[in-house]
Amino acid sequence: VAVVRCNGTCANRPRVNQYDGAKSCAIAASLYGGETGCSFGCLGCGDCVTACQFDAIHMNPETGLPEVDESKCTACGACAKACPRNIIEIRPQGKKSRRVYVQCVNKDKGAVARKACTVACIGCGKCVKVCPFEAITLENNLAYIDPNKCKSCRKCEEVCPQGTIIALNFPPRKPKTEGEAPKAEA
């Protein structure tokens, strides 16, 4: 299924440019780099929506990001090919459609990434250290979770200081019971 690897909603990314021409991600990427300070994130013009023949992806007007309707997605890859920033990735659905992934593609160093987007991966490496299955690598200041190695333990999600690691289609976590010892920091 297609996953959108950007969580830079309108609230998370400061606007730095405004363009009143044709709304196209391809045009935005080639002419002016988009309206936000993140040079890696979603451009928000919807080329992915136009490319989808199955009506499986739509732009959320509140967040400015595309959302995938998993019940309609055939994982054909048309949306991924249409994205000039390569933020859409085709991933296996996993057990009960559960997935854990890094919802960011920003390769800037921590402080620069955080300035461009408040929920960007800062490359701290906490997720790499806590993963018991060696499913996470850190390359070019960005964490990546290998879907073939990930066992969905979600320890990485717990330690991510930016909230960039997303776990989809899992039941809610059980609340901690009173007197339960806090988990050690990684």
PLM region spans:
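Ferredoxin-type iron-sulfur electron-transfer modules and their immediate structural context
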Residues: 1-124, 128-130, 159, 163-186
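Strongly charged, low-complexity linkers/loops
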Residues: 126, 132-144
